[in-house]
Swiss-Prot record:
Its EC number is 3.1.26.5. InterPro entries: Pop5/Rpp14/Rnp2-like (IPR002759), Rnp2-like_sf (IPR038085). This is Ribonuclease P protein component 2. Belongs to the eukaryotic/archaeal RNase P protein component 2 family. It comes from the Archaea. It catalyses: Endonucleolytic cleavage of RNA, removing 5'-extranucleotides from tRNA precursor. The keyword Metal-binding does not apply. Keywords: Cytoplasm, Endonuclease, Hydrolase, Nuclease, tRNA processing. It is an enzyme of class 3 (hydrolase). The gene is rnp2. One of its GO terms (biological process) is tRNA 5'-leader removal. GO terms for molecular function: ribonuclease P activity. The keyword Transport does not apply.
Length: 164
């Protein structure tokens, strides 16, 4: 099959997306892609989501934090951003997604908006609710194990882990 001339080929834009979830959430690329397609279909309808052509082209996720590059057609960036914003859960795990930026090439999007994933610090001495508990520290954010109820999100100053 012959290649299309350059002026006929579809032009793409790449959305750099940040993903946050609880530390025990295991979210695979296919799960995030499915949630994105579902959100785009619900928001834009079948013709609109097909026109936007949102697709995850790069993905990394570990310990509750991840990044993705989402491809969208050039004229549909605002609709693709709205579809990404509609993703609130992936495989029953609540997630927070944010579009960090938009670029015309994958390389530029990676260099400008994706910073790589730092390794979170797992600790067993987080002071929370008058007790020492297990927790995961990521920068100023701390996710504390709250018994059978799951996780509680807090800041370092709330947990007494300043400067340690």
């Amino acid at each position: 099959m012959k290649h299309l001339p350059k002026h006929v080929r579809p032009r793409w834009r790449y959305l750099a997306v940040g993903i946050e979830a609880w530390p025990d959430a295991g979210i695979e690329r296919s799960d995030f892609q499915r949630a994105l397609w579902f959100a785009a279909g619900n928001l834009l309808g079948d013709p609109g989501s097909a026109d936007a052509g949102v697709r995850v082209v790069a993905y990394s996720f570990r310990d509750g934090r991840g990044e993705a590059l989402v491809r969208a057609r050039r004229g549909t960036v605002s609709r693709a951003r709205a579809a990404v914003a509609c993703v609130s859960a992936v495989r029953e795990h609540p997630v927070r997604v944010c579009v960090r930026g938009v670029s015309g090439t994958m390389r530029a999007a990676r260099e400008r908006y994706l910073d790589g994933l730092d390794t979170p610090e797992r600790r067993s001495d987080v002071a929370f609710d008058g007790d020492a508990r297990d927790g995961v520290c990521r920068g100023e954010n701390v996710d504390v194990v709250a018994g059978d109820d799951g996780w509680v999100g807090a800041r370092r100053r709330d947990c007494g882990t300043d400067g340690e």
